[in-house]
C-alpha cells in the first residue's frame, strides 16, 4: 500500500472538552461514513467554557498531542471555546491539517442572513472571546453581530432536558434580547446546542435561520479532505471504525454521549493519567 493510501486510511481525530463534540462525530458519520474516527473527550477537565484562555490553550495542546500520537490524518477541534482561544496556537505548533468549528459557522451565517443582523449563542468563554463577531465582521463589516451566552443550555442538554416548558422558558429568557434586535440568523455556537435545536427554532420563530456549526464544520472537513486527497473513499472501504477515549468516567460518557451521537456507544476507553502524562501514552 502506498504512503498516500495509508494516509487516507488513518482516522480523523476529533476532540472536545467532553461530550458536545459528539454532535460533530454524528455529522461525520452521516456525511463521511467510510472515514475512521478517533474521538477524545477531556471529561476530567470539562467545561472549558469557564476557564482562562491560557488554561484552555494548554488543555487543547495536550488533547491535540494525544491525537497526533494516535496517527490521525486530520484534526477537528469540536469545541467552540477551544476553537476561539486555542486554534491559532495549535495550527502553529502542529503540522497536521485541522479545522475548528467557528469559521464554518461564521461563513454559513453570512450566506444565510438577508438583513445582515446575526445572533450568536454559546458558552461564557466563547462569547467573551468575541471570536464569532471578529470573524464575521472581518468578512462583512456591514453586518451587526449580537452575542449572548447561554450557560444553562449545556447542563440541560447533558441531562436530557431537550424540550418541554422548562427548557422553552430558559430559551425565551436567553433569546428574547437577540430577537428584539431584529436578527434573521442565529448561530448555535456550542456543539451541545444541536440537541436543543427544536426548542430554539420554536422560540426564535420561522423568520430566523439557525446555523448548526456541527453540520457546517463537517461540510468544510469534507471539502478539505478532497482538496488534500485524504478522503477514504476507495471501493473496498466499508463503514469506518469509531473509537472513543475519555479522561474520566467512561460509563457516564457512554450513557450521556449516546444521546449526542444518536446511537449507543458500546465501548469507551479511559486514558489513565496516573503516571506518564496521558497524552504521551
For the regions a language model picked out, list residue spans one by one.
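Non-catalytic structural scaffold of enzyme domains
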Residues: 2-281
Amino acid at each position: 500500500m502506498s504512503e498516500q493510501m495509508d494516509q487516507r486510511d488513518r482516522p480523523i481525530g476529533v476532540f472536545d472538552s467532553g461530550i458536545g463534540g459528539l454532535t460533530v462525530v454524528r455529522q461525520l458519520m452521516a456525511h463521511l461514513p467510510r472515514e475512521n474516527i478517533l474521538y477524545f473527550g477531556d471529561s476530567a477537565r470539562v467545561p472549558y467554557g469557564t476557564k482562562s484562555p491560557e488554561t484552555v490553550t494548554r488543555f487543547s495542546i495536550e488533547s491535540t498531542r494525544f491525537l497526533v500520537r494516535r496517527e490521525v490524518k486530520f484534526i477537528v477541534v469540536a469545541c467552540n471555546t477551544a476553537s476561539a482561544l486555542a486554534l491559532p496556537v495549535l495550527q502553529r505548533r502542529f503540522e497536521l491539517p485541522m479545522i475548528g468549528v467557528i469559521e464554518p459557522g461564521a461563513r454559513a451565517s453570512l450566506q444565510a442572513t438577508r438583513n445582515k443582523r446575526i445572533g450568536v449563542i454559546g458558552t461564557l468563554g466563547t462569547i467573551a472571546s468575541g471570536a464569532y463577531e471578529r470573524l464575521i465582521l472581518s468578512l462583512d463589516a456591514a453586518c451587526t453581530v449580537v452575542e449572548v451566552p447561554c450557560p444553562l443550555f449545556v447542563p440541560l442538554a447533558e441531562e436530557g432536558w431537550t424540550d418541554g416548558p422548562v427548557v422553552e422558558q430558559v430559551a425565551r429568557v436567553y433569546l428574547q434580547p437577540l430577537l428584539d434586535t431584529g436578527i434573521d440568523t442565529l448561530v448555535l455556537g456550542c456543539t451541545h446546542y444541536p440537541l436543543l435545536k427544536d426548542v430554539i427554532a420554536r422560540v426564535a420563530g420561522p423568520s430566523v435561520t439557525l446555523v448548526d456549526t456541527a453540520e457546517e464544520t463537517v461540510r468544510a472537513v469534507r471539502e478539505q479532505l478532497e482538496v488534500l486527497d485524504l478522503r477514504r473513499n476507495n471501493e473496498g472501504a466499508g463503514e469506518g471504525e469509531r473509537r472513543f477515549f475519555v479522561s474520566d468516567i467512561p460509563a457516564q460518557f457512554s450513557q450521556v454521549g449516546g444521546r449526542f451521537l444518536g446511537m449507543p456507544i458500546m465501548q469507551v476507553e479511559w486514558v489513565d493519567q496516573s503516571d506518564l502524562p496521558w497524552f504521551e501514552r
